[in-house]
Amino acid sequence: ANPRQVRDMFRLLQSELGSGVTMTAHFHDTRGMGLANMEAALDAGIRSFDACLAGLGGCPWAPGATGNMVMEDGVFMAEAMGLRTGIDLDALCGIRELIETNLPDARLSGAIAKAGVPKGYAPATQFAVAAE
């Protein structure tokens, strides 16, 4: 899916189902669209997301597919946009290091792991985003 499709679909679902239904978005990052699709879902009002530490996983029906959207990257993006997740990004990155140590052959992904958290980064203090 691309961001326009995601935004349109969630807006349609919300108009049909009403505001009493909580929806969760589930994106893979196989073609680099995970964070862009998350932003589109946020724009459509979605506040709950599936994600996976270090992007672990994949899809048995799609050879070469990556795992779910990288949790560390999603948390960083949400917090950088002013959305409070309640997740300690430093602790999350520490858990990722444990995964790297204990699963040396695992195919891991994620921009925050490669580039690090920018200097001066501070977690958001505004709206809450549900962490699943």
Where are these regions (language model features)?
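Catalytic cores and adjacent flexible loops of soluble metabolic enzymes
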Residues: 1-132
